[in-house]
């Protein structure tokens, strides 16, 4: 092992110059924009502030015309009328542009982007997304977007999170608001199996929103999960939300997914980030393999 004891200088130089960055802990140190997985946070912010209700609907024509230039939905022909659950399922940009706009206008009726992003940042922090996770090794500090309430609402703007942050975020969502400080070590035992140290995750905070809010976002994620064939065909009742995020036009989009199962009694949460992974289908396939491993399907 060239990394054990005295390190081979030439080998270390080779690793440090490798474009695949093998010395980087991608799960804790690499950050990307989250893309549409942030729409769950936007939904919670909208529902809890009263911007949204169970029946609140926005019409998606394919573009958001309250600002110029008008940002587009990923479905250029539009989704038609969307509520919060169907908007999570369909990942409708225009619905969430409206939420971002209305959050920014909620103070005095005038559009104030900084006010809108500050609300989303508050919920991102409470959900454990925009704060450090507390693990035993170094992690990079996450950043909640502070520009363009409209773009921030769909997970663009200046959001920067690691896969670790997304894992903590979806765990909080699955737990209906219990946010944990994450740990890599559950417990330490001696050679005879006697407990030396209990290192179970501790509660950081709880997110005080209504049961209706949790029910709506869980339903939206359940509906979304049922549209992802490689997850739905497993039969594990997986709730999920995917995302693709563009940071540079010269590089492929990032692919993300947050998920938990089973959606009616969660016991496992999975987050996947594929930097420059092109499309969310790549992240979905990886998540499916994690679930198959967890449930032992890959051993059958």
Language-model segment annotations:
Residues 195-202, 286-300:
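Short, gly/Ser/Thr-rich active-site loops of penicillin-recognizing serine hydrolases
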Residues 1-36, 41-275:
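Beta-lactam-recognizing serine transpeptidase/beta-lactamase-like catalytic domain environment
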Residues 166, 279-288:
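Short, charged, low-complexity patches
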């Amino acid at each position: 092992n060239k990394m054990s004891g005295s390190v081979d200088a030439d080998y270390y130089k080779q690793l440090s110059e490798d474009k695949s960055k093998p010395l980087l802990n991608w799960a804790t140190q690499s950050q990307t924009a989250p893309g549409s997985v942030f729409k769950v946070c936007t939904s919670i912010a909208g529902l809890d502030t009263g911007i949204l209700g169970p029946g609140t609907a926005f019409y998606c024509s394919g573009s958001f015309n309250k600002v110029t230039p008008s940002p587009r939905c990923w479905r250029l022909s539009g989704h038609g009328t969307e509520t919060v659950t169907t908007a999570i399922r369909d990942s409708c940009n225009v619905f969430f542009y409206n939420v971002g706009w209305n959050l920014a206008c909620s103070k005095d009726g005038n559009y104030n982007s900084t006010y809108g992003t500050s609300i989303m940042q508050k919920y991102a922090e409470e959900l454990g997304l925009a704060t450090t996770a507390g693990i035993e090794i170094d992690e990079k500090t996450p950043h909640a977007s502070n520009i363009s309430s409209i773009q921030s609402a769909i997970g663009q703007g200046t959001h920067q999170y690691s896969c670790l942050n997304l894992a903590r975020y979806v765990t909080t969502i699955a737990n209906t608001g219990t946010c944990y400080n994450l740990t890599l070590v559950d417990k330490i035992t001696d050679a005879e199996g006697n407990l030396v140290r209990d290192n179970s995750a501790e509660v950081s905070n709880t997110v005080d929103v209504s049961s209706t809010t949790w029910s709506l976002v869980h339903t939206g994620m359940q509906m979304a999960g049922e549209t992802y064939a490689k997850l739905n065909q497993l039969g594990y009742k997986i709730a999920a939300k995917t995302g693709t995020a563009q940071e540079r036009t010269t590089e492929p989009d990032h692919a993300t997914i947050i998920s938990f199962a089973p959606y009616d009694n969660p016991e496992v949460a999975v987050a996947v980030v594929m930097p420059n992974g092109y499309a969310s289908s790549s992240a979905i396939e990886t998540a499916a393999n994690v679930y198959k491993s967890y449930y032992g399907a890959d051993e059958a």
